[in-house]
Amino acid sequence: MVITLPKLKYALNALSPHISEETLNFHYNKHHAGYVNKLNTLIKDTPFAEKSLLDIVKESSGAIFNNAAQIWNHTFYWDSMGPDCGGEPHGEIKEKIQEDFGSFNNFKEQFSNILCGHFGSGWGWLALNNNNKLVILQTHDAGNPIKDNTGIPILTCDIWEHAYYIDYRNDRASYVKAWWNLVNWNFANENLKKAMQK
């Protein structure tokens, strides 16, 4: 099974001015595509060549895991954002955030602090844990909650420097602030609904 680069659901300029077309082009067509190409090279003629991307993420380690997880994480990241998104949450995710964090503002502040305070490259996640509570998680490098079995991902934000350096240089806080204007709450609601049924 050849792993392919998932198609973006919006144009490369659709997230501007918060994330520029230049950033999205490099991030998607160079970084994300690079992980796909590298993974296909690594798994050729191995048992992983017949497995799905998700199974590779769960079962692999080392370079194969790093590339597989980065493919999965980036696809989830693109879907966590969208044009004409952002603002306050709605529907079940709004109610669940209020239940587990007290208010959306509390959640937003806590999540932003995790994203800005994370040392080095990684990811920030909103996930549903085994106790059906929303939690904020941070993973290093290619890590994700699926591999760590720490929760079911609901949303993610990429905090590798390549996600923001063209637009914001070393100012991660400004990137995080801009990211809130792109959060796809419909995607979060879909993920929460599926997670609650498991």
Swiss-Prot record:
Subunit structure: Homodimer.
Subcellular location: Cytoplasm
UniProt protein name: Superoxide dismutase [Fe]
Coiled-coil regions, chain positions: none
Annotated positions binding Fe cation: H27, H74, D158, H162
Reaction equations catalysed: 2 superoxide + 2 H(+) = H2O2 + O2
Co-factor note (free text): Binds 1 Fe cation per subunit.
Organism of derivation: Plasmodium falciparum (isolate 3D7)
PANTHER family according to UniProt: SUPEROXIDE DISMUTASE (PTHR42769), SUPEROXIDE DISMUTASE [FE] 2, CHLOROPLASTIC (PTHR42769:SF3)
Listed EC numbers: 1.15.1.1
UniProt xrefs under PROSITE patterns: SOD_MN
Top EC category: oxidoreductase
Superkingdom assignment: Eukaryota
